[in-house]
């Protein structure tokens, strides 16, 4: 008989075969990697290509309001970048989340209005992935801290609106953030999320 109480296992010797089997299983339990350990060991260093995910590891973004943490994957290659206007000048878009670039991008791209940067991101199909988006300003801040060398010089658009006429942008070379006129053409670089 096997009894489990308060995480303690008691084996009775009534069936030596069953007792030996359970004892062998329990003996190897400490050596077996947990699912979390196995997932963590597969995470490449920040800035390295993440095989099968379509780009480079941009770092771990903390979830907001109890939401799950996620890894930012930074798109690679010529088709992952563009120079575009943010769009929607003199419009209050509602894309004001400073942390949820995915929601901002979807809102802008599906609005039926002209938002070139968000539409570029929303339509992207890169490395077999179709969930690319324009990062929110806090996601840009994380990328600026972790992998500034992976960005070209100059300001890049975020998906976060600042006001009716301005949107947030990030300078990865110097780490500064500011706002620019939505009609201005700036760099765009796509990201996606990976939850583990």
Give a label for each model feature.
Residues 1-128, 182-184, 192-196:
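Short, compositionally biased
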Residues 114-115, 136-138:
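Mixed-charge, polar/low-complexity N-terminal
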Residues 1-19, 129-131, 137-196:
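C-terminal, surface-exposed recognition/capping segments
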